[in-house]
Structure formats: C-alpha cells, structure tokens
Amino acid sequence: MQLFKLKTRLSEFDSFADFAKEFTKEDLIITNEFLYNPYMRGLNLPCRFIMQEQYGMGEPSDEMINHILADIQLENYTRVIAVGGGTVIDISKLFTLRGIVNATDAFERKIPIEKARQLVILPTTCGTG
C-alpha cells in the first residue's frame, strides 16, 4: 500500500535571501538558531519560525513534536519549510499532515495520512533529506 508520494523538484539559489523572496505569513519555517541568526534574522521575513532546539535536543521524540504542535495549533500555514538537518526535516515532514495535533496519533495511524501542506526542504548536512 502506498501511503503517500513525493514529487521532488530541485532548485538552486545564490543566497538564502534569494530563496526566501517568496516567503509569506502562511509559511512555517522549522530551523535551528545557529542557522537562523546569521542567515535569516536580518531578512525580517513575515513567516513563523520554530527553533527546534528550544524543544529538545537529539532525535525527534513524540514529546518534542507535541510541544511544537501545542505552540502552533492555532496558526494557519500552507507551507512547511525545513532548514536544517535530519531532526528538523523529520519534524517538518510530519507537520504537512492534515489534522495532526498529536504525534502519537500520526505514528499509530489514528489520523489519515493525508498531506495538507506543501513541504520545502533545505538540507544543511550531507545525507539528510
């Protein structure tokens, strides 16, 4: 059974500023502070930023994901943008699902695996994505 299908498109930009030109208030960016401070902070982008390390370190856990979900549950976003390594990307993939309010519900398939948001990934380490 095929749960979902990814349609990949590769793009190239000269800088993060060029990449971010089309970001809107409906974008949710999940990243790390060590990337945000030098590359994103000065751009004054209208989107919501989540700094993954503020919710825990290491591999993503149900607890980490649920804390982030609790902070953004009332926000409307149409696109999830992951800028970072494996943890950031894994969390971002989950946040594209329709109706997700609890990580365990998604992992146990208590909610339909239905994509509701576009996913954009900017991997920052080799082997991620």
Which role fits each region the language model picked out?
Residues 1-79:
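ATP/NTP phosphate-donor binding region
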